[in-house]
C-alpha cells in the first residue's frame, strides 16, 4: 500500500512538473490576452467619457440651466424640445459604466479541491495550493480563496468586498511556498459565522494578477458554488473555469452546472485535471468522451465545435472543453473570446446610443431647414390668398346688390302665401287673447305686431342668407381651406398667447361672407329701417280703437308689413354693411399678419443659429464618437484588415486591395488620414450617412471601418473603410470599349442609384466616371459616397469634380439637382463611348477658367453620332436653371424608352454603335 501511495505521489509530482512549463506558458498567453483587452477597454472608456461630456454640454446648452453657456436658447425649450430630450439613456449609461469599471476575474470551480488547486497552481506557477490525495478529498472543508495583486506576499482572512478579519494564521508564523492547509480549511469547531464565511485573501506580486483576480471556489460542504458567483458576478468580468478530475460528471455536478447556466448564463472553460489519455474535442474520427456528451446534453457545448473553441455553424455557446491539462494555455483563447464579447456588447450599446441621437439631430436639422424655407413662403402665400379673397368678396358685393334685390323680391313672392298663413295661425307669446274676440289694449296690439314682424323677418332672413351663401360658396374651396391650414401652422410655431389673432380676423372676413344674418338680428341699419316701416303700420292701425285679434287681422298686418318692405333698400343695406365689415376685417388681418411675421422673424433667426450649430458642431462631434465606437466594434469582431497592393489614389485617400475581411471577399480598403478636426468630423458624419443607408444593388456596399492608431508608425491616425471590390470603373470600361446596349444599361443603373439616394434625402455631389464601378457583368454601382450629405446638413461647400459641377455649386446654394447636372455630363461620355474631354472643357487652361466658362453657360458639344432624344435628355439635365432639370423619376423612364427604341427594335441606330 505504501509503495502504491509513493508511486501515485511520484506520478503526480512528475505531472505537475510537466505542466509547470505549460502553466507558465499559459500565464504568458493570458497576460497577452489581457493586454489586448486592456488596450481596447481604454479606448471604450475614453469614448464613454467623451460621450458623457457631450451629453452634459447639450443639457447645459438647452435646458436653461443657471450658468449655461447659451442662455439665449433657454426660453426655446418648447420649440427645441427635441434637442432638450437628447440625453444619455440612464439604463445604457449605467450598463456601460459597470462594463468599463469591471475588473476581470477568473473563477475556478470544479468537482473537488484537488482539481481546482491544480488549475490555480497551473495559472500562477509553483505549488501555492496543496494537492489533496483521494482520502483527503472526502473530508475536505476548504474555504474560498481569492488571489489579488500586491507588492508583497500576504495572507489574510476577509469578508468578500468588506473588511479584513483579525485572525492569527499559520502562514504568519514563517516563510512558505505552499499555503498551509490549516489556513485553507474551515475548522469544524468554528462557531463565528463571519469566520466560517470569510475567504482567504492572498496577495502576490505576480504579473498575471496585475490584470485579473483569481477566485477559487470553496468545497461544497463549506459553501455552495452559486454563493461565490452571486457575491462577485455583478461587478466583475467573469471568466469561469471548471476543473474536471473524474471521468464523468456526477449527478451533483450536473445540477450545479445547470444552476449556473440558468441563473448566470456564463460560458465555461472545462478542463480535465486528471492524467488521462489525450482526448481533444476536435478529433474528427475519434470517439467522443462521456464528458463531452454530458456537456452537450447540458447545453454547454454544441456539435460542430473545433478543439480551439471556435463556434461551428449554428453554434451560439462559446463554452470550451479541453481534455488535456497540458493544453491549459487554451484558456487564453477562451478568456480573450469572453472579454472580447463583453467589449463588443458594450461597443454595440454605445454605438446604438450615438446613432439614435445622431439621427435625432439630423431629423431636427431637416425640420429646422424646412422651417427656414417654408415659413416665409407660408406667410407670403397667406397674404396673397387673403388679398385674393378680399378682392373677390368686394367684387361680389358690388355686383350682388341687384341680384340681392331680385332675390329678396323673388323670395317674398314665393313665400308670401306661406308667411300670411303662418301669421294667421300664429300663437302669441306672453299675450292673453280673449276667446270671445273682445278688443285688447293698444300695448298688447303693439306686442302682437312685433311678434308678427319677428316671424316675417326671421323667415326672410333664413331664405335670403341660404341663397347668398350658395352664390359665393365656391370661395371656400378656392381660398379658405389651404389658407386656414397655413395660418394654423404659422400660429402653432409661434408660441405666444396672442398668436391666434390673425385667424380670428380671417374668421371675421369669412363671417362677413357667410353669416350675413347678423345684420338682421342686431341693432343694424336694416333692422332700424324695418322697424320704421312697422311703426308706420302701427300708426295707421292704432289711431282708432283697439281692434279684435282675429286670424284675419293677423293676416292683414302681415300683408301690410310685407308690402311696405323695400327690396332695393334691404339689398343696398346688406351690401353696404357687408363691404364695411369686410374692409375692417381685411385691415385687421393685414396688421395681425404683419405682427405674426415679425414674431416669426425673431424665431427664425434663432432657428437658423441653432441649425448652424447642429450642422457644424453637435452632429459632427457626435458622429466622430459614433465612428470610433463602430470602428471599435468592427475591429473586435473582425480584426484589423490586411492591406494589399495599391489600387488607386484620390484627393482624400488611397485605395488598396484587401483579400477578405469580416466574411466578405474580395474587398477594397480606402485609407483616409484626416488632417485636422474639421476633416475628422466631416468624415465621421459622412460615414454615418453611408452606414445609415439601406443596402441597394446600385450602391457599393460598405462593410465596416477600422481606426488605425499606428498608421505611419504611429505618427498619424487613419480611418480604414472596407467596401466591396468590383471589376473596374466606368472610365476604364469606356476606354476598353462597351456596346451601346451595355452603356445605356449602365446609365440606367446610375440613374437608379442616384434616384435611391435622393429618395433617402441624400445628395451624392460627385457623380463622375471614376465613381461608377462595374462588375464582371458590366452592371454599375455608385461608389465613393464621401461627399454624400442630406440636403438639410449641406453647408454650401464647393465639392466635386470641376467638369461635372453644376454652376450653382459655386454660389453655395444648391440641392439634389446638382446630381442631375452631373449625370447629364456623365451621359454625354456614355453616349460618346469614349473618355475624351468635350471641346468646351478641353480648351480651358485651368480650373478657374473652366468654372467661369460653366457659369457663363459652356456645355459639351453635340457629336454627330448622338441620337436626338439622347441629346435632348443631356440638355435637360445640364440646364442652367436647377428648377428646370428633370427629376430622376422622370429621367429613368425616358432613358428606358431610349434603350428600348435603340437596342430592342430592328431599327437600331447605327451611328451610336459606330462609336464603340
UniProtKB/Swiss-Prot annotation:
Binding site for ATP: 647-655, 670
Annotated Protein kinase domain residues: 641-895
InterPro entries for the chain: Dual_SerThr-Tyr_Kinase (IPR051302), Kinase-like_dom_sf (IPR011009), Prot_kinase_dom (IPR000719), Protein_kinase_ATP_BS (IPR017441), Ser/Thr_kinase_AS (IPR008271)
Superkingdom to which the source organism belongs: Eukaryota
UniProt record, GO biological process: cellular response to fibroblast growth factor stimulus; embryonic organ development; negative regulation of apoptotic process; positive regulation of ERK1 and ERK2 cascade; positive regulation of fibroblast growth factor receptor signaling pathway
Transport is among the record's keywords: no
Residue segments, region Disordered: 1-27
Compositional bias ranges of the Basic and acidic residues kind: 1-19
Enzyme class name: transferase
Keywords annotated in UniProt: ATP-binding, Cell junction, Cell membrane, Cytoplasm, Developmental protein, Kinase, Membrane, Nucleotide-binding, Serine/threonine-protein kinase, Transferase, Tyrosine-protein kinase
GO MF annotation list: ATP binding; protein serine kinase activity; protein serine/threonine kinase activity; protein serine/threonine/tyrosine kinase activity; protein tyrosine kinase activity
Active site: 766 (proton acceptor)
SMART domains: S_TKc
One matching Pfam family: Pkinase
Subcellular localization: Cytoplasm; Cell membrane; Apical cell membrane; Basolateral cell membrane
Coiled coil: none
Stored Gene3D superfamilies: Phosphorylase Kinase, domain 1, Transferase(Phosphotransferase) domain 1
SUPFAM superfamilies: Protein kinase-like (PK-like)
Catalytic reaction annotation: L-seryl-[protein] + ATP = O-phospho-L-seryl-[protein] + ADP + H(+); L-threonyl-[protein] + ATP = O-phospho-L-threonyl-[protein] + ADP + H(+); L-tyrosyl-[protein] + ATP = O-phospho-L-tyrosyl-[protein] + ADP + H(+)
Enzyme Commission numbers on file: 2.7.12.1
A single Gene Ontology CC term: cytoplasm
Family: Belongs to the protein kinase superfamily. Ser/Thr protein kinase family.
Function according to Swiss-Prot or TrEMBL: May act as a positive regulator of ERK phosphorylation downstream of fibroblast growth factor-receptor activation. May induce both caspase-dependent apoptosis and caspase-independent cell death. May play a role in the embryonic development.
Protein name: Dual serine/threonine and tyrosine protein kinase
